[in-house]
Regions:
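Short active-site neighborhood of thiol/selenol oxidoreductases, capturing the structured segment around
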Residues: 1-10, 16
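Long, His/Glu/Asp-enriched segments that create or flank divalent metal/ion-associated functional microenvironments
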Residues: 2, 44-46, 50
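Catalytic core segments in nucleotide and nucleic-acid processing enzymes
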Residues: 11-16, 64, 70-73, 99
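Conserved helix-turn-beta segment immediately C-terminal to the redox Cys motif
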Residues: 11-39, 110-111
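Thiol-based oxidoreductase modules, predominantly thioredoxin-like and allied folds used
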Residues: 28-46, 57-69
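Short, internal strand/loop/helix patches
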Residues: 49-83, 90
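Thiol-/selenol-based redox modules, centered on thioredoxin-like
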Residues: 82, 87-114
């Protein structure tokens, strides 16, 4: 969960880009691949689209909710602030919340298929 207007979110984006570049398309012991799904809690579609382009967010799964923190999906996941990152397993288990780049990278590397 992020927003184009959120400075800490924009600061995190280069790390997400690195994770996408490193793990996209790779097989894991317990998952077919790794996907990033970006949910933006936004005010203006133009700013959201511009931030995706400027930050180089090349993964295909982007969603914007213009109700921001009042959105159904933010409430469903208990988002109280952004950025908020969830690591969700293929069976829907939340394996991590707001993991650091280093911890997330370690978690993924440990699960790569040989």
């Amino acid at each position: 969960f992020w927003g184009s207007w959120c400075a800490p979110c924009r600061k995190d984006n280069p790390y997400l880009v690195k994770l996408h570049e490193e793990f996209n398309g790779r097989a894991f012991k317990d998952a077919k691949t790794f996907h990033i799904v970006s949910v933006a809690l936004e005010m203006k579609p133009e700013r959201w689209k511009a931030a995706i382009a400027k930050d180089g967010l090349k993964w295909p799964y982007h969603h914007a909710d213009f109700k921001r923190m009042d959105s159904d999906i933010a409430r469903l996941y208990g988002v109280r602030e952004i950025p908020t990152k969830y690591l969700i397993t293929p069976d829907g288990y939340i394996a991590g919340v707001n993991m650091s780049y280093e911890d997330l990278r370690k978690f993924l590397n440990e699960r790569l298929a040989s």
